[in-house]
């Protein structure tokens, strides 16, 4: 079965796992997912992730969710740019999430990064998702 939005699927798995208080969730591996997970880990929204390779050539990420005092660190996570409606922004119009308390993850010519990094590097791009 083909998946039309692999990144959206990963975000949904994270959201559902956090709602059910799971310690970890699994998702098929891809390079875009790895770069988004790197940003989530560096910003402190997940504890980490590991890649598991299978004999059939496929791979899977196991994402360790992060909790603080019993509540998930991720309150909201959602896709902004979707396969049917891409959202591109310039550096001046990068959205802030919850007045800067959350992050927006962008895919830029300089790589996948958080909104504050894109502002520092003066680069815009596609708004992949927002996290709060």
UniProtKB/Swiss-Prot annotation:
Domain of life of the source: Bacteria
Alphabetized InterPro entries for the sequence: Ribosomal_uS8 (IPR000630), Ribosomal_uS8_CS (IPR047863), Ribosomal_uS8_sf (IPR035987)
Presence of keyword rRNA-binding: yes
Keyword presence, RNA-binding: yes
Pfam family, one: Ribosomal_S8
Annotated GO MF terms: rRNA binding; structural constituent of ribosome
Gene3D superfamilies reported in the protein's UniProt record: 3.30.1370.30, 3.30.1490.10
Keywords: Ribonucleoprotein, Ribosomal protein, RNA-binding, rRNA-binding
GO biological process terms held by the UniProt record: translation
GO cellular component terms, semicolon-separated: ribonucleoprotein complex; ribosome
Role description: One of the primary rRNA binding proteins, it binds directly to 16S rRNA central domain where it helps coordinate assembly of the platform of the 30S subunit.
PANTHER family assigned: 40S RIBOSOMAL PROTEIN S15A
Family: Belongs to the universal ribosomal protein uS8 family.
Subunit and interaction comment: Part of the 30S ribosomal subunit. Contacts proteins S5 and S12.
Cited NCBIfam families: PRK00136.1
Protein name per the record: Small ribosomal subunit protein uS8
Organism per entry: Agrobacterium fabrum (strain C58 / ATCC 33970)
